[in-house]
Amino acid sequence: FGLEDHLSNSSISKDINTAFSALFNLWGVYYEPEEGNPCEQAKAQNLQCWLQKGSINQIKRLNRPAILTLNDSLGEKHQILVTSLEEKVATILIGDQTLNVSLMDISQYWYGDYLILWRPATQFENDLVPGIEDVGVGWLRESLSIITGNIDTNIPAELYGATLERYVRDYQKKKRLTVDGIVGVQTQIAINTDLQVPNTPFLSRIP
């Protein structure tokens, strides 16, 4: 059976609730379809949803399990969960079945819509931008010192100053992220990956 056969099999649950239930399970948290918006349920358990339109390479860089929306030959939408990614093959969960499929096969049915969960390190809600004074800056400074060895002794510690911005830009360049000094979702996820934050599911092994 190919991917199309599984998509057209009406006995396999391929709805968003099935996909969210599997995704929440990978993160070790609880999902109840009858309790409302899944992203609100995630937030209540210290996770955030991130819904994007992008490429497989972008998902590889994020290195988090992702729900993809696939469109079959009849135009019907189906949700699958990508649990592992290699160079040319993905492991997906479709309903309760695990399949290894080529990225080429996925590309025939996928137009780029995906959703991931990620775990913010602190309770700050907004991006960290140069010049801001925020509790999240303390986390950023400490995290980069662990990852890169670059120590910024700026006082006050919660002020995002010029030295820290330079370290952030260097880090973003190394990670092939947008080099703008703004610590948004992608930069925070990259930092969490390098820190190997406990209880975080990855798509591929960390080198």
Each model region followed by its residue ranges:
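Extracytoplasmic glycan-interaction modules
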Residues: 1-7, 56, 121, 151, ...
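Extracytoplasmic/secreted envelope proteins and their assembly/folding machinery
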Residues: 16-24, 65, 79, 103, ...
